């Protein structure tokens, strides 16, 4: 319970205390997007690592040497908890955005940080918007930003171990032109 409180408190404090940095990043985003990307990515990776530390999470990555570091990758995985995002973001190379449910875009500050790290918001009830989001994701991949998606569309509800298979966690390399 103490770790849970530490995690929630850390995330909340980060969102509040990072407002000045967020405002600066939003101001420089148009003129210096590469600086904005690098700083945003570094700050989010840092806070995710802090949260993982406070939660007592130990990470073991197998096969990371198989992931290309010189181009964008589409990551596909099973969604077990919000920690999937923290673990993935802190372990994959380069810039990586996530496909997230639209409801998260309604949370002030969180939405801004998610946009800065190239997250895409999906309205699961609107097929037309879903197609537009897929096209936006393709553009992100072409521009060099990896994308992570959890195709189930929500976190797994059972405690049973997920079956290993093609969708358990994989990556797809797309050619860039």
Language-model segments: which ranges?
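Glycine-rich helix-loop-beta junction characteristic of Rossmann-like nucleotide cofactor-binding loops
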Residues: 65-67
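Catalytic core of membrane glycerolipid acyltransferases/transacylases, capturing the structured
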Residues: 22-42, 53-54, 69-127
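Charged helix-capping and loop-helix junction motifs
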Residues: 133, 162-168
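A hydrophobic membrane-anchoring feature enriched in long, contiguous, low-charge segments
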Residues: 2-27
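Residue-level preference for the first positions of well-ordered beta-strands
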Residues: 72-74, 146-150
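Short, solvent-exposed loop/turn segments at secondary-structure junctions
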Residues: 156-159
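Conserved small/polar residues in nucleotide/adenosyl-binding loops
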Residues: 170-176
């Amino acid at each position: 319970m103490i770790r849970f409180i530490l995690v929630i408190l850390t995330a909340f404090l980060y969102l509040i205390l990072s407002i000045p940095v967020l405002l600066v990043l939003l101001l420089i985003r148009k003129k210096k997007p590469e600086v904005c990307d690098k700083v945003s990515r570094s700050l989010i990776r840092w806070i995710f690592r802090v949260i993982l530390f406070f939660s007592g999470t130990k990470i073991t990555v197998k096969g990371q040497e198989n992931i290309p570091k010189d181009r964008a990758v589409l990551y596909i995985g099973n969604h077990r908890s919000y920690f999937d995002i923290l673990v993935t973001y802190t372990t994959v190379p380069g810039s990586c955005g996530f496909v997230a449910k639209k409801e998260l875009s309604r949370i002030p500050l969180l939405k801004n940080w998610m946009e800065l790290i190239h997250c895409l918001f999906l309205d699961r009830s609107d097929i037309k918007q879903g197609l537009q989001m897929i096209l936006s994701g393709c553009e992100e991949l072409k521009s060099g930003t990896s994308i992570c998606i959890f195709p189930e569309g929500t976190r797994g509800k059972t405690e049973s171990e997920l079956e290993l298979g093609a969708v358990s966690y994989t990556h797809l390399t797309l050619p860039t032109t």
